[in-house]
Amino acid sequence: MIQPQLKQIAETAYLTMYSQRPELCNIQETFYGWVVFVASPRGKAVVKFSREIGRLAKEITGLKRLSDCLDCSVPEVLFFGREEGYDYIMMEWLDGMSAHDLPNDPVALESFRESYTDLLLALHDNQAQQGFELTEDQYEPCLIKAFDSWMAPVLRYVQSGCSPFSPKLKEAYGSMWERKEEILSPINNNSSFVHDDCHVGNVLFDPRTFKVAAILDPCDAGYKHREFDLFHLYDVRPDLKLVERYQEKVPLAEGFELRRWFLSLWDDAKHSRNMGWYDEAWLTSKVNQFNEIYAHR
């Protein structure tokens, strides 16, 4: 198994940083890789490994950019290393509890709901006059053209002979691609800085106040459209009704419910391309939701 090897790398990294071996070394598997929590009386840290080549470099940049935009805690990267063929980053271990575990108490839920939507609004208020971000220092003023740049490689993957996507799903993605201009035109306006994976599993809360304590794990953070964040809020703890609260503060353009499924499906395809993940029943269910809303638009 790979986990003992990664734990050993994390322990060595901790020894390098703190001149002492950790007394705690706990590894957890995540979607994109593994996270090792290491601690001793000298300090605590998190060592992160990724299955995707290049993902950690993107995360370092994303964390720095998020910290420039937000007034809540964002993990500081202590160093970026490579051992035994594995890239890793050592980061701060921030205090707080996963918002996935928020108690079902009305006061707690309301405090978190208000805190997190305010924080997302502040993040999305960061806009780029040049438009939507393609790569570093390259922007496109038209969202449809930017989406084409972001997702054309994903479409090629989905439609390729080596992808796991079924013929029916390939047809569905081809149909959605042909409709992208119609679907995205209502939000072809201002860009916003987005986290790009902002479900509450990537948020820590303060167990005393139930407010946001920290934001973790950005994906492809950059200047997109705020709705590229909002559909993620349904992924974990939809009972929090975060999108509903967000819309009370900033109305969304007509057609959001359709775009929600559209963007979510393309995001799933991106993760499949990055990681080889594939869940046909999950994707088919989303396609059915999209088709039903499209038919009644």
Feature locations, PLM:
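ATP-binding pocket architecture of kinase catalytic cores
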Residues: 24-138
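Conserved catalytic motifs of the protein kinase core domain
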Residues: 42, 86, 190-191, 211
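ATP/Mg2+ or Mg2+-diphosphate-binding catalytic cores
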Residues: 248, 270-297
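Active-site Asp-x-Gly
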Residues: 191-193, 199-258
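An alpha-helical support segment within catalytic cores of ATP-dependent transferases
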Residues: 2-18, 113, 125-196, 206-208, ...
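Hydrophobic alpha-helical segments that form the core
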Residues: 260-270
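Acidic-and-aromatic substrate-binding clefts and catalytic sites of carbohydrate-active enzymes
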Residues: 53-56, 236-239, 277
